[in-house]
Amino acid sequence: MLGWTLVFLVVAVIAGLLGFTGIAGAAAGIAKIIFLIFIVLLVISLLVNAFRGKSPRL
């Protein structure tokens, strides 16, 4: 589960960098939406992992 959390975080950061720095100006709106989706998935993944009470696996 922690592995997926890290994947969501990396994808969100990459989407944010591409969308918010002007590198992909035409796709900034799409990058912002993808950024928000993956941030939500990251939070859900962290909450599920916390409520399970299991130690994280890498």
From Swiss-Prot:
The chain crosses the membrane at residues 6-26, 28-48. Keywords: Cell membrane, Membrane, Transmembrane, Transmembrane helix. InterPro entries: DUF1328. It is a multi-pass membrane protein. This is UPF0391 membrane protein Sbal_1421. Belongs to the UPF0391 family. GO terms for cellular component: plasma membrane. It is found in: Cell membrane.
